[in-house]
Amino acid sequence: MEGKYLYFASDDDTSPDGAGDSILYPVNSIAGMEPEASNSLKIYFKPRNTSSFVEDDHESVSITITGNKHKQVMDAIIAEINSGSRDGGFITVADVPNSIFLSSDIIGCTDIAVLT
């Protein structure tokens, strides 16, 4: 696979091995990001299932962040996407079970919502 991909693993389980526990998205599927609360950022993605006929259907991942650091976290994600490719284009944004985060302002991943 060519390109860059964003990886998320939630804190729902110590082993992200089921539906909704972890997900990998190509960066070109990002549809936007928005604050969800003072300590939460929602990242929207174009759906992986292309059989959806609703134009505004999106999948999303909610990450927990340091309070009011939305812009800094969005900057960090975009900077990593735009940087030279490392690790085969695999970008870990939030891997809660392994305590790996793209930025020190990212502290969790609470919701992975996919279309079925």
Region locations from a protein language model:
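Eukaryotic intrinsically disordered, low-complexity regulatory linkers and tails enriched in Ser/Thr/Pro
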Residues: 1-116
